[in-house]
Amino acid sequence: MKGSRIELGDVTPHNIKQLKRLNQVIFPVSYNDKFYKDVLEVGELAKLAYFNDIAVGAVCCRVDHSQNQKRLYIMTLGCLAPYRRLGIGTKMLNHVLNICEKDGTFDNIYLHVQISNESAIDFYRKFGFEIIETKKNYYKRIEPADAHVLQKNLKVPSGQNAETQKTDN
């Protein structure tokens, strides 16, 4: 698709309805009003994706302080089916990864993926995410209800450096 433009734009009170509509079409789960209220507060961690000026996807994240770590949780990252495999998801995920890299204080980035969503699992694996656990009955009212937790570590564990990791093989 030569000449096509992929851009990311802020989520604002003026376009939050677009985000709601996209999420209703893309995801098998419903998000409540609190989700959308919170999305308006996260700034650069929520973006609409535009393909030639048409909103076709979105990414919404939040900072999570759990397990004595600073983590970034990808609440949603998705794109309308006809616009998949055009680099839109990659642009959204790279945006989030760049934020984490610039910040420098995140330990990891993680998300939940329905166990049957092999294309999403493959997508995240290309970026270095790994399945770290499977949560039984994570989803309500959708089948399969189980979700994989995918995580990408952003910091080398303390006490290790690149040299010791190489020699441990």
From Swiss-Prot:
Record function comment: N-alpha-acetyltransferase that acetylates the N-terminus of proteins that retain their initiating methionine. Has a broad substrate specificity: able to acetylate the initiator methionine of most peptides, except for those with a proline in second position. Also displays N-epsilon-acetyltransferase activity by mediating acetylation of the side chain of specific lysines on proteins. Autoacetylates in vivo. The relevance of N-epsilon-acetyltransferase activity is however unclear: able to acetylate H4 in vitro, but this result has not been confirmed in vivo.
Amino-acid positions noted as binding substrate in the UniProt annotation, renumbered to this chain: Y31, M75
Primary localization: cytoplasm
Biological processes per GO annotation: establishment of mitotic sister chromatid cohesion; mitotic sister chromatid cohesion, centromeric; N-terminal protein amino acid acetylation; post-translational protein modification
Annotated N-acetyltransferase domain residues: 6-155
Phosphothreonine PTM sites in chain numbering: T12
Binding of acetyl-CoA, residues: L77, G78, C79, L80, A81, P82, Y83, R84, R85, L86, G87, I88, G89, T90
Keyword Transferase: yes
Pfam families assigned to the protein according to its UniProt record, in alphabetical order: Acetyltransf_1
Record PTM N6-acetyllysine, positions in chain: K34, K37, K140
Keywords: Acetylation, Acyltransferase, Cytoplasm, Nucleus, Phosphoprotein, Transferase
SUPFAM superfamilies registered for this protein in UniProt: Acyl-CoA N-acyltransferases (Nat)
InterPro entries named among the record's database cross-references: Acyl_CoA_acyltransferase (IPR016181), GNAT_dom (IPR000182), N-term/lysine_N-AcTrnsfr (IPR051556)
Chain sites annotated for binding CoA: N117, E118, S119, A120, I121, D122, F123, Y124, R125, K126
EC id: 2.3.1.258, 2.3.1.-
GO molecular function term, any single one: histone H4 acetyltransferase activity
Region described as Substrate: 138-141
Active site: Y73, H112
The name this protein goes by in its record: N-alpha-acetyltransferase 50
Reaction(s) the record says it catalyses: N-terminal L-methionyl-L-alanyl-[protein] + acetyl-CoA = N-terminal N(alpha)-acetyl-L-methionyl-L-alanyl-[protein] + CoA + H(+); N-terminal L-methionyl-L-seryl-[protein] + acetyl-CoA = N-terminal N(alpha)-acetyl-L-methionyl-L-seryl-[protein] + CoA + H(+); N-terminal L-methionyl-L-valyl-[protein] + acetyl-CoA = N-terminal N(alpha)-acetyl-L-methionyl-L-valyl-[protein] + CoA + H(+); N-terminal L-methionyl-L-threonyl-[protein] + acetyl-CoA = N-terminal N(alpha)-acetyl-L-methionyl-L-threonyl-[protein] + CoA + H(+)
